[in-house]
Amino acid sequence: KLMTAYLTFAAIKQGTIKLDQTVPVSEKAWKAPGSRMFIQVNTQVKVEDLIKGMIVQSGNDACVALAEAIAGGEENFAQMMNREAQRLGMKASSFRNASGLPDPQHYTTARDLATLAGALIRDFPEEYSKYYSLKEFRYNNITQPNRNRLLFLDPTVDGVKTGFTDAAGYCLISSAKRGPRRLLSVVLGAASDGVRAQESLKLLNYGFQFYDAVQLYAKDQPVSNLKVWKGGSSTVKAGFQGDFILAVPKGFAPRLQTELVSQQPLMAPVSAGQTIATLKVSLDGKPYGEYPVVALEAVPVAGAIGRAIDSVRLWFK
């Protein structure tokens, strides 16, 4: 449902659908098993109501209706989900439906879910703050509370999403903001609703107490100038489109080391925002994380002479 929300917000931003637009409820959406917001077949429902039903009530029916409105069908929408997962760097995920219902080819990991949740908060901050902290939603004369218990237990928690299937157990992606810092936690396979909330709160408290937020690079600060072949410019500035901040155990920041691994040969054209390198971070010589580095500017293709010269240089490289 988190990926479905991400793609829904993207579709609204692109003008594919609108918040106040009504969409038809198909029989497939109406029959969706599991948790529902109880939309009725052959009726029209506002997109914003479907968003609330999906996020607050965990409505599988709402997910199917949104998928059909955006992509014309759930299978097409699943293809969009997989493309977006690749773009976001979710390396161990495969999507087959919009709701997260069990399927042998539908899977993900805690790391990938954290990546997705972080991307949603980063890319759609207004939508996140508007919908994910809602404590209840009423539709079709039925009021359902948000299944995220932490919203009622800790005022610093403002999301994100619960999940449950017999195979996966009780799951919770949670986020809290205390002062300027925001942390995410992911708990999968808990034995009960209470356990997933308890373990999530433990993780958040531990993170805030024992980790520092360390900024390694500022937004649009060049990490390096990388060589570009056959381009109008011979180099391109590489960096991050937002402040690059890591959670690091308290007192360990001076022991971090970084290594930039570029994608060579890097050929023009290069678009701004294109991933062109990886920043490898280590702590005390042990891998700590790998993070995509993007082009901070565009580099067009060079003219015929410039391309020919670089072709010769590449031949002897």
Name these PLM-found stretches.
Residues L2-A114, G118-D123, F137:
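Active-site-adjacent loops and short helices of periplasmic peptidoglycan-processing enzymes
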